[in-house]
């Protein structure tokens, strides 16, 4: 960590099709071994399927799905006097997006559908309907924070 000033985050170029920075970040999360064009084709295919299924615009449906997966609180381990407590802390906005994207991609990869585009489309439509593995993950994180609310005074 720098001592003088905090480092400003790098600017990310918006994606070529929709012009969304959020979608560009999602493409980068999905990308494996630097194959960005493959990741883009998977995501654009999934968004097309999602738009047909929901009847909304693709980007609108994507953002709705992401909103349902974003966590507001999480637990962090804190060692106090020889014992470790799970302390609930609020999640900063950039981390909310990062976690939501990561959870959606992980859930899509674990699905058993035919292609990755179809798996991603199914996971995004489930997330938009407030169900699915990614939403369950968010609920679990919130449940953990709720269960450990008694240790909130250990926050740092």
Curated annotation (Swiss-Prot):
Keywords assigned by UniProt, alphabetized: Ribonucleoprotein, Ribosomal protein, RNA-binding, rRNA-binding, tRNA-binding
Keyword tRNA-binding among UniProt keywords: yes
Record InterPro entries: Ribosomal_uS7 (IPR000235), Ribosomal_uS7_bac/org-type (IPR005717), Ribosomal_uS7_CS (IPR020606), Ribosomal_uS7_dom (IPR023798), Ribosomal_uS7_dom_sf (IPR036823)
Pfam families registered for this protein in UniProt: Ribosomal_S7 (PF00177)
Highest rank taxon of the organism: Bacteria
GO CC term, one of those recorded: small ribosomal subunit
GO biological process: one example: translation
PANTHER family hit by this protein: RIBOSOMAL PROTEIN S7 (PTHR11205)
Family per similarity comment: Belongs to the universal ribosomal protein uS7 family.
Subunit note: Part of the 30S ribosomal subunit. Contacts proteins S9 and S11.
Name of the protein described by the UniProt record: Small ribosomal subunit protein uS7
Species: Actinobacillus pleuropneumoniae serotype 5b (strain L20)
């Amino acid at each position: 960590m720098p001592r003088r000033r905090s480092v400003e985050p790098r600017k990310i170029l918006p994606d070529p099709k929709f012009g969304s920075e959020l979608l560009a970040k999602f493409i980068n999360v999905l990308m494996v071994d630097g194959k960005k064009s493959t990741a883009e084709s998977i995501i654009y295919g999934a968004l097309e399927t999602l738009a047909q299924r929901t009847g909304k615009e693709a980007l609108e449906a994507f953002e709705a799905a992401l909103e349902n997966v974003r966590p507001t609180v999480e637990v962090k381990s804190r060692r106090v006097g020889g014992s470790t407590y799970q302390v609930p802390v609020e999640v900063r906005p950039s981390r909310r997006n990062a976690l939501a994207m990561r959870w959606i991609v992980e859930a899509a990869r674990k699905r058993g559908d035919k292609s990755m585009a179809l798996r991603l489309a199914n996971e995004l439509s489930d997330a938009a309907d407030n169900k699915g593995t990614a939403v369950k993950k968010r609920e679990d994180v919130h449940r953990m924070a709720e269960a450990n609310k008694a240790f909130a005074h250990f926050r740092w």
